[in-house]
């Protein structure tokens, strides 16, 4: 939270100070009002006696706090002053309360704003393994629900953390000052009240943790089923998935019911003990003071206002206890949420290397003794002993069975994963000594999953230019020309120009209104528009027909002749004309040579090629 406070400007810092101050001022007024009301009631019940004293010239004296008295010249003056005082105090209390709520709202709202901004920035910068560890659904809950709980806690802290204890302490002090005999009842019931509240709050912490886990689980369930809707439909898994959701929903319902039940028990228990306090107080007063009577005798009329004031302060005490209990409940929930937020914020970020005056490097790529793995210890070094070199300006292919580690290599090249051991060199220089921004601009990668952003085709293709300093101040006409050139390279112009609004055609979230092949071509155009020196195509033309794929490869070869091109595919026909082909099997290099030589030396390559040929692959077509 200290990091959030540093982001506050003068206005928010002022609100941070004013919120508890005005809350405290409101509490003082709330505590004084019952005493003025008790004095006003005393005037009403003792009006005959007071008028007699006024007529005799003794003046009018009315009981106030702690046996003090308010003196007036006449009964009428007492009535006017007391009534006016109560009205003015109530108005001031209202104004102070509104100001404190307004200030607390400003601070709480900005706390959630800065927290969300900080968490989102962290999500954008954490390492890929950390992102994989959480998953998008869990990160979404922490960015929204957990931050909202922190917003509530901030508001409660500024309002209730001041209001609750002072209402309790102030109410207790004024109750004792009003009627010490009746206050003995508080010593009997309050220990029991505190004991019950303490037990309930202790039980609430694990219940809220389980509830948050249930929220994560049901979000994961929904995200999986919604994103995999077509699979569910095609395999007729609707009933199966509904049963899984029913189980997750039942767990969430059970945890929510338990946590809500336990954390709302404090309210009825508190009111029960409050009622017991009043009953015990009345019994004590009747036992200790035999002069108390419920009759209109003037001598006993003064006790009635004190009983009224005591009951009012008892209400404040109860209110303070309830607010304290609710604050503790929210604190418990927010503490769990804060722990989950800190867990994300403490995750390591992708290391950025800043190298002033970065020299231009040749687009060669070399792996030396690289090992990497994800998940548990058994998979820690799934990729092992990767030693290879891609020369600048040439085309290379990476092929292998499903799950062999091809995409892991692509992610390592793209800088998403750092190897567990070994070194990577670009242009003969270790990537640890290369400026990170320079390296990111140097390497362009088109992933298997082509994620497009909501907007237009133009905004998606030109997104690669947004972070390029050399393009920031270029006119739109030049950017449009680069966009159309990139679309032509990716053969995306053929379908884009069929739209009535061409490049301004709307792209829905994740590109849902485009076909798989259209999304792949837009993704390729988005990458080649930046003219990367090293281009990685990770199975990114799988949805294209053979002729379109051939045309895209030719365009890339002709338009980016100096670029080192790395094509990852399961289809050997897509990469067999590369200068060299690297065969990956179970995370290791099984072969690295030309197509012709691999047919003589690599059994896995031969088997894959024969299997694809048996399935109808055309290996005689000209690439």
Curated annotation (Swiss-Prot):
Show the GO cellular component annotation of the record.
plasma membrane
Matching entries from InterPro entries are given as: AAA+_ATPase, ABC1_TM_dom, ABC1_TM_sf, ABC_transporter-like_ATP-bd, ABC_transporter-like_CS, P-loop_NTPase, Type_1_exporter
- Binding positions for ATP per the UniProt entry: 400-407
Instruction: State its location(s).
Output: Cell membrane
Any one GO molecular-function label of the UniProt entry: ATP hydrolysis activity
Stated membrane topology is:
Multi-pass membrane protein
Q: Which domain of life is it from?
A: Bacteria
For this protein, the record's Pfam families field holds: ABC_membrane, ABC_tran
The reply on keyword Nucleotide-binding is yes
| Membrane-spanning segments | 27-47, 86-106, 157-177, 180-200, 266-286, 307-327
> What keywords tag this UniProt record?
ATP-binding, Cell membrane, Membrane, Nucleotide-binding, Transmembrane, Transmembrane helix, Transport
Q: Which residues form the ABC transporter domain?
A: 365-611
**In this protein, which residues make up the domain named ABC transmembrane type-1?**
16-325
Note the SMART domains from the entry. AAA (SM00382)
Annotated family: Belongs to the ABC transporter superfamily.
**PANTHER family in the cross-refs:** ATP-BINDING CASSETTE SUB-FAMILY B MEMBER 10, MITOCHONDRIAL, ATP-DEPENDENT PERMEASE MDL1, MITOCHONDRIAL
Protein name listed in UniProt? Putative ABC transporter ATP-binding protein MG014 homolog
Origin species, per record, is Mycoplasma pneumoniae (strain ATCC 29342 / M129 / Subtype 1) (Mycoplasmoides pneumoniae)
């Amino acid at each position: 939270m200290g990091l959030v406070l540093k982001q506050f400007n003068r206005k928010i810092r002022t609100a941070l100070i004013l919120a508890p101050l005005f809350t405290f001022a409101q509490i003082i007024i709330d505590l004084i009002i019952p005493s003025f009301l008790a004095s006003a009631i005393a005037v009403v019940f003792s009006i005959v006696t007071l008028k007699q004293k006024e007529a005799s010239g003794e003046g009018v004296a009315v009981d106030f706090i702690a046996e003090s008295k308010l003196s007036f010249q006449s009964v009428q003056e007492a009535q006017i002053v007391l009534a006016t005082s109560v009205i003015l105090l109530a108005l001031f209390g209202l104004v102070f309360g509104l100001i404190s709520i307004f200030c607390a709202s400003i601070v709480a709202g900005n706390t959630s704003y800065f927290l969300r901004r900080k968490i989102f920035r962290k999500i954008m910068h954490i390492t890929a393994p950390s992102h994989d560890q959480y998953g998008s659904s869990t990160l979404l809950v922490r960015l929204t629900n957990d931050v909202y709980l922190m917003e509530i806690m901030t508001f409660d802290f500024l309002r209730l953390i001041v209001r609750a204890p002072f209402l309790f302490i102030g109410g207790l002090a004024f109750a004792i000052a009003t009627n010490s005999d009746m206050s003995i009842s508080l010593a009997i019931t309050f220990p029991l009240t505190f004991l019950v509240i303490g037990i309930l709050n202790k039980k609430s912490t694990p219940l809220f943790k389980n509830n948050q886990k249930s929220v994560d689980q049901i979000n994961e369930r929904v995200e999986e089923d919604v994103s995999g809707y077509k699979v569910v439909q095609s395999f007729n898994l609707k009933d199966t998935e509904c049963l899984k959701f029913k189980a997750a929903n039942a767990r969430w319902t059970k945890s929510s019911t338990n946590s809500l039940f336990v954390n709302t028990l404090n309210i009825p228990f508190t009111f029960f003990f409050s009622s017991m306090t009043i009953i015990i107080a009345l019994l004590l007063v009747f036992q200790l003071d035999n002069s108390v009577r419920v009759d209109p005798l003037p001598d006993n009329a003064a006790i009635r206002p004190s009983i009224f004031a005591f009951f009012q302060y008892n209400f404040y005490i109860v209110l303070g206890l309830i607010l304290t209990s609710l604050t503790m409940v929210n604190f418990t929930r927010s503490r769990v949420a804060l722990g989950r937020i800190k867990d994300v914020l403490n995750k390591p970020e992708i290391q950025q290397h800043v190298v002033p005056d970065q020299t231009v490097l040749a687009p060669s790529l070399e792996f030396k003794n690289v090992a990497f793995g994800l998940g548990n210890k058994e998979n820690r070094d799934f990729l092992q002993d990767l030693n290879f070199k891609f020369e600048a300006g040439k085309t290379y292919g990476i092929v292998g069975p499903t799950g062999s580690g091809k995409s892991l290599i692509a992610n390592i090249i793209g800088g998403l994963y750092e190897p567990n051991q070994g070194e990577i060199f670009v242009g003969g220089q270790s990537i640890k000594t290369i400026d990170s921004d320079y390296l990111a601009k140097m390497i362009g990668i088109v992933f298997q999953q082509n994620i497009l952003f909501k907007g237009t085709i133009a905004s998606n293709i030109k997104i690669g230019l947004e972070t390029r300093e050399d393009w920031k101040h270029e006119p739109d006409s030049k950017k449009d020309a680069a966009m159309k050139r990139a679309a032509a390279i990716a053969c995306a112009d053929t379908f884009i120009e069929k739209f009535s609004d061409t490049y301004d055609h709307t792209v829905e979230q994740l590109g849902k209104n485009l076909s798989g092949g259209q999304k792949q071509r837009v993704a390729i155009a988005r990458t080649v528009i930046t003219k990367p020196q090293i281009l990685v195509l990770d199975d990114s033309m799988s949805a294209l027909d053979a002729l379109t794929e051939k045309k895209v490869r030719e365009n890339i070869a002709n338009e980016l002749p100096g670029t080192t091109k790395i094509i990852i595919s399961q289809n050997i026909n897509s990469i067999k004309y590369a200068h060299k082909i690297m065969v990956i099997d179970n995370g290791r290099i099984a072969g690295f040579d030309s197509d012709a030589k691999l047919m003589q030396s690599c059994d896995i390559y031969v088997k894959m090629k024969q299997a694809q040929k048996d399935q109808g692959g055309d290996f005689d077509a000209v690439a």
